[in-house]
Amino acid sequence: MLKLFSAFRKEKVWDFNGGIHPPEMKTQSNGTPLRQLPLPGRFIIPLKQHIGSEGEICVAPGDKVLRGQPLTIGRGRMLPVHAPTSGTVTAIMPHPTAHPSALPELSVIIDADGEDRWIARDGWSDYQCRSREALIERIHQFGVAGLGGAGFPTGTKLQGGGDKIETLIINAAECEPYITADDRLMQDCAAQIIDGVRILAHILQPREVLIGIEDNKPQAISMMRAVLHGEHKIRLRVIPTKYPSGGAKQLTQILTGKQVPHGGRSSDIGVLMQNVGTAFAVKRAIIDGEPLTERVVTLTGEAVGRPGNVWARIGTPVRHLLEHAGFIPTSEQLVIMGGPLMGFTLPGLDVPVVKITNCLLAPSATEMGAPQEEQHCIRCSACADACPADLLPQQLYWFSVGQQHDKATAHNLADCIECGACAYVCPSNIPLVQYFRQEKAEIRAIAEEEKRAAEAKARFEARQARLEREKAARLERHKKSAVQPSGQDQDAIQAALARVREKKGDDQPIIVAAGAKPDNSAVIAAREARKAEARARQAEKVQQEMAANSSVPAHEATEPEIDASAESVDPRKAAVEAAIARAKARKAAQAGENATADEKPAEPIDPRKAAVEAAIARAKARKAAQAGENATADEKPAEPIDPRKAAVEAAIARAKARKAAQAGENATADEKPAEPIDPRKAAVEAAIARAKARKAAQAGENATADEKPAEPIDPRKATVEAAIARAKARKAAQAGERAQAANEENEAEDPRKAAVAAAIARVQARKAAEKVVNED
């Protein structure tokens, strides 16, 4: 019983959804055996006849070639093409090929010499002793591709299968209603096909090998069964006739009951499929050592006088084949490459036969029927019922018309096998397959553009990264090539660094408590020590200068007479020396401010008294100078003195004394306030005092004109006394300034009023000086 169920399962076939049953037209061409046709005079071999990129050309115009000689080099998925006959390469140029768009593709043009000489052929009859990789490489280099219509490189397909293939399926369904190429090939070359199947099984090592053939080919079925008699590894499965049972996914489901997932391949479920024509080409490549240079082509249609199947060389013009088949064209004649459901109309008869050409259909006008006008979709869903891929052709049609590429992709447009079943059943005569092909082409173009954009972005980012690396390398080189210090400089640098490290090591860590103020007592003490040292040096220097100015020789003070030869005293020089002394005293006083900050301030001096004393001292100095002038009247006259300059110098001295007096006023702010002094009144009183002193001096001069002159006054002593008086006044003023700083609550005098008063005093003093000069 178990054996019965096992045998039943082995012969079981499944079904797929959808599908149609168009009228059979195979009897037009499958009744005659395969035949050879005369060679054409010129062959056109396109470089790309398969899925993938075209190979690299290895011939040039003028080269002599033999049949089977490679015209291109195949690397990776690039499949080489070979010369179909012996002859001369006349050109390599673009030429229209077998494509609905008739776009020109690069092709090699060969003029045949008629000899049809082969290259040296090396067959591997002992292929079972060869490695799997060697067999796959030979299949690839001999240009074998899928001859069922897809044109996928067979070597690449076998290489990708690897060790995961459990079932090898040989597709012999040939479901198109007009095509009989595989049918006739199985009738005439069944043994060679089985040899090719054994080679494929040797490479893949599958668990089972199945040959699927429709039941509308009785002669082919009988021939294949005869060859497979006694073969246990290869089983023949006869399936019901239904279009499109020859599709890869549909035949896989029929023979195994497994469905290929959306977007996947049959190899994902452990199944690999090859066409019977591909198996025959594999046998000739491995055992006979012949590259793929020809294939079986069906010539059929009511416009063909002698329909049948012929051996057509790759690159043969379509016109040449039809002429030898008795083609009688009519008005508006159509020539279709492929079947009526999955084929396409040729743009011209000069296109060549390629590896995927399996049929040339030339129907009459009555055979194909009058072209029907396309109408609007009525949403009948007949297309969805007929679709073998379980798609929604109606919805895909709307997406294609509306250029909604994303939605079309989301609805699995890529799973469409373009079988034409939907267009066949459409009552509105909508060419759905054409819309789907166009939409696929647009999606591929968009994907290619995105891929190029991504590659360009990757190149740009790589370039930016390279530039950044080069920039970093340049900066590193510049740093390394910078001027290095010499040995001595390096030693000095290391010594300095060592001192810094030692100092850092000696430093105690500073810990600051939260909320506490930093302890700067050490820094303040060091700063105060430096200031005290500087003040001491300044005080010592001032004392030395004052001692030098105050020291006068005793004999000069007591000598009653003035030596006539002695150098007379220049009053201007004396005034300059006095100004210098005052400046030095002022600097010394300023330097001593900070030194005496903590001492008890001296008793403040009344600025009015100081001003009066200064005026008296200046009057005495002037009187002494005038007495000196009278004493030397008979002697050599001294250099004349400019009275205006002297007046200006005196005014400057008075202004400085006034500033000192004003500073002293602030010093007495903390004491009992004295009666406020108006600076203008003080200046007026000082001017009056000076005028009185000057008049008294003049009166004294007139009174003693006839008498013996009084003892002359040394002008230098008078100048020194005046300088000492001014220094005392300035010191008192500075003491007042320190007292003012100690009392922050004291109100400061308006500086603008003081400046105005000082200016008025200077003007009055200048006028008084000019008056004195005029009186003299």
From Swiss-Prot:
UniProt EC number: 7.-.-.-
Q: Where does [4Fe-4S] cluster 2 bind?
A: C387, C416, C419, C422
Q: Which domain of life is it from?
A: Bacteria
For this UniProt entry, which segments traverse the membrane?
none
Keyword Endoplasmic reticulum listed: no
Please report the record's description of how this protein sits within the membrane.
Peripheral membrane protein
The cofactor note reads: Binds 2 [4Fe-4S] clusters per subunit.
- What does the entry give for GO biological process? electron transport chain
Q: What Gene3D superfamilies does the database record attribute to this sequence?
A: 3.30.70.20, NADH-ubiquinone oxidoreductase 51kDa subunit
Major subcellular site: membrane
Enzyme class (EC, first level) = translocase
Basic and acidic residues biased stretches: 534-543, 597-611, 633-647, 669-683, 705-719
Q: What sequence ranges are listed for the domain 4Fe-4S ferredoxin-type?
A: 368-397, 407-436
Composition-biased stretches (Low complexity): 721-743
Localization in the cell: Cell inner membrane
Q: Where does [4Fe-4S] cluster 1 bind?
A: C377, C380, C383, C426
Which Gene Ontology MF annotations are present?
4 iron, 4 sulfur cluster binding; electron transfer activity; metal ion binding
Key word Cytoplasm present in the record? no
| Positions of region (Disordered) | 534-754
- Alphabetically list the UniProt keywords: 4Fe-4S, Cell inner membrane, Cell membrane, Electron transport, Iron, Iron-sulfur, Membrane, Metal-binding, Repeat, Translocase, Transport
Pfam families with a match to the protein in the record: Complex1_51K, Fer4_7, RnfC_N, SLBB
One GO cellular component this record assigns the protein to is: plasma membrane
Per the similarity annotation, which family is this?
Belongs to the 4Fe4S bacterial-type ferredoxin family. RnfC subfamily.
Subunit structure, interactors included: The complex is composed of six subunits: RnfA, RnfB, RnfC, RnfD, RnfE and RnfG.
The job of this chain, per UniProt, is described as:
Part of a membrane-bound complex that couples electron transfer with translocation of ions across the membrane.
> What is the recorded name of this protein?
Ion-translocating oxidoreductase complex subunit C
Give the organism, scientific name.
Cronobacter sakazakii (strain ATCC BAA-894) (Enterobacter sakazakii)
Q: What is the lineage of its organism?
A: Bacteria, Pseudomonadati, Pseudomonadota, Gammaproteobacteria, Enterobacterales
